[in-house]
């Protein structure tokens, strides 16, 4: 994968280690800080104590998280975009239950217009259609899934045009690359063992991933 040359690891002590593969000895550490006033307690409003994957809609006014207690994707509205301290839980009636597909939902992501939702759980990624964009309560399972090659699939991200899906493999310590011949359509997905990045030397049990805007850097949370 192109992004394999550039990786970043978020460490438990709150530092970010970025490694540029073009300069193998070049590693920088940057301290990550946050304001305690910007913390939002999911369990207090939704009863969910085992939060996993997170995602936003395209303008930051809605936030979603996958919860292992209810096996559901829950929806929150933010009065200030991307400010979680302004989040309001929309209630259990506005969630998407995924129990029939997985009992451990982890990573979640949307397609480019919010009409599709993807949920990683156990060894698969599952695809759902939303009749109203970014409204998970309108979601229905497409009866389409794809085996990721890892029995504990966590964070998932698409590239910018939806022709590649990347999966953090918690058990295998790999980042799997999945190719889609039709953008955002899991039924057209294929995977090769050669198209994976092992992060075992840097990040045991990777939980989530993110790219920079042009896909030249990959960041891994473990």
Task: Please name every model-derived segment.
Residues 25-222:
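Polar, enzyme-active/binding microenvironments
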